[in-house]
């Protein structure tokens, strides 16, 4: 899912992750291991041990572990050319009594990544239910290594999965106001695959280059959308992906590398972007929300200097980046040792079931033969969260991705950071702090901006600060996954932001027609 930081179903053993521990989204359970990582490749000791905190209940009854640690397939000579292979599709079990599949414009495809040995990236593209000249929006789920199909079926996609595995239309899908792309990335995630593990990515440079190459091929395949406004969105660990991807697109445009991509903005929902600031906010948020007591707060805060020092070593050389992951996640783990069975994605709820939420219907649905045939994915088993992709990206975890954002703001590319108020793991407080601490020409004015209500149907749905291209929105009554918890508000947020009207306080309804 999303760090969620994706939704991570991941655990560690001597060579990869073992189903003895399950990490969902950005969830970080206690982790103690010895590691060496020459050339940015991580090798975990077989002596790795994990406290039993929530481990068994996280894996019980949910079969999200793939047979392989990441999706792989034998090389196919017909796939050697870097190109898009795409088909229009209809999902079974969905009422298509309205427009035809041709009119709907639902596409599934694979892209052969040029800077790889055998990697193919899977994507879904849903043309707007409104106007074809609506903006093109790409959504990235976190993990790292978790499939964007989690968002398709549980957040902002066109459909929702019913208990009987039938599909119903999502009245607040983001395809009601945009031409919407979901990508399984990095390679090895979801239906994306490779036959060579050297294609796995270890940093945002590799991730952003792959996404940029994909966009170039996508707009070459769909030139009628190339001049539309373009926005990058996502949540959780995508707080890393999104700034790097936006910078890569902007760099490509300035260098005139290929098709000009009309990048207008990027939005990060409950993301991990500046780990040093955000990890320091854990105890403040936990104390404010009554999760820990003052004595706990004082004790856990003694870990903060060690975390800050580990992040500094990571940023200066990279050799200690896995160590910084271990050291800093001890802060979160100490809080969870006290909190017990709280749902760290929504502290109003108990963590019940596997991932604190039950997403097992999606796994069952996507592995049905009729669905796989419809999507054209052949015999590839759907992987919700790839353990090996997650492991490969650990050296990237504690990197600060905020550093590239000011240059984008100065060039007029707008940023929306939004966060549900009841999420612990990527809480609104930490996100607000890095946004306010970011140095750019409008920093002082943004810090002095009035906090105004964000209204939906005349009712306050959040609190907004905004100046120039930068906006921060604290969303009421939502946890880690805002589009799932507040679907109407999230659609209104997207529409208003893309139209430059997010700071408006009028009660006028702007949600797309039903």
Where are these regions (language model features)?
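Terminal and linker regions of secretory-pathway proteins
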Residues: 2-514
């Amino acid at each position: 899912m999303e760090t969620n930081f994706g939704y991570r179903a991941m655990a560690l053993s001597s060579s990869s992750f073992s189903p003895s521990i399950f990490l969902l989204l950005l969830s970080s359970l206690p982790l103690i291991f010895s590691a060496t990582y020459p050339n940015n490749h991580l090798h975990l000791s077989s002596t790795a041990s994990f406290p039993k905190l929530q481990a068994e209940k996280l894996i019980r009854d949910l079969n999200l572990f793939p047979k392989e640690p990441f999706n792989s397939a034998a090389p196919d000579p017909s796939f050697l050319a870097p190109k898009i292979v795409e088909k229009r599709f209809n999902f079974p079990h969905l009422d298509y009594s309205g427009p035809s599949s041709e009119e709907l414009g639902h596409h599934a495809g694979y892209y052969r990544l040029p800077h790889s040995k055998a990697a193919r990236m899977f994507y879904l593209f849903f043309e707007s239910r409104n106007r074809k000249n609506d903006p093109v929006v790409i959504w990235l789920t976190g993990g790292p290594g978790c499939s964007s199909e989690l968002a398709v079926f549980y957040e902002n996609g066109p459909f929702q999965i019913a208990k009987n595995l039938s599909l119903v239309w999502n009245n607040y899908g983001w395809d009601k106001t945009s031409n919407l792309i979901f990508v399984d990335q990095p390679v090895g995630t979801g239906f994306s695959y490779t036959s060579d593990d050297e294609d796995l990515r270890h940093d945002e440079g590799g991730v952003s280059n792959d996404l940029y190459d994909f966009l170039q091929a996508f707009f070459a395949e769909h030139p009628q959308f190339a001049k539309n406004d373009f926005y990058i969105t996502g949540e959780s660990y995508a707080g890393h992906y999104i700034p790097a991807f936006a910078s890569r697109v902007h760099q490509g445009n300035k260098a005139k590398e290929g098709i000009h991509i009309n990048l207008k903005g990027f939005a990060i929902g409950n993301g991990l972007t500046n780990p040093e600031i955000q990890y320091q906010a854990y105890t403040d948020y936990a104390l404010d929300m009554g999760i820990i007591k003052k004595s706990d707060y004082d004790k856990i805060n003694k870990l903060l200097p060690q975390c800050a020092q580990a992040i500094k070593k990571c940023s200066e050389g990279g050799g200690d980046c896995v160590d910084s992951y271990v050291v800093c996640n001890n802060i979160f783990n100490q809080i969870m040792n006290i909190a017990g069975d709280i749902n760290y994605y929504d502290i109003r709820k108990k963590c019940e079931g596997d991932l604190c939420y039950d997403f097992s219907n999606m796994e069952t649905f996507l592995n049905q033969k009729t669905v796989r045939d419809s999507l054209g994915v052949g015999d590839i088993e759907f992987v919700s969260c790839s353990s090996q992709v997650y492991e490969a990206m650990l050296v990237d975890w504690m990197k600060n991705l905020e550093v590239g954002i000011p240059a984008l703001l100065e060039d007029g590319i707008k940023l929306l950071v939004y966060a549900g108020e009841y999420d612990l793991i990527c809480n609104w407080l930490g996100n607000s702090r890095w946004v306010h601490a970011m140095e750019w020409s409008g920093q002082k004015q943004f810090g002095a901006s009035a906090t105004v209500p964000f209204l939906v149907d005349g009712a306050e749905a959040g609190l907004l600060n905004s100046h120039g291209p930068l906006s921060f929105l604290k969303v009421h009554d939502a946890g880690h996954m805002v589009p799932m918890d507040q679907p109407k508000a999230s659609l209104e947020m997207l529409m208003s932001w893309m139209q430059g009207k997010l700071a408006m306080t009028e009660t006028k309804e702007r949600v797309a027609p039903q």
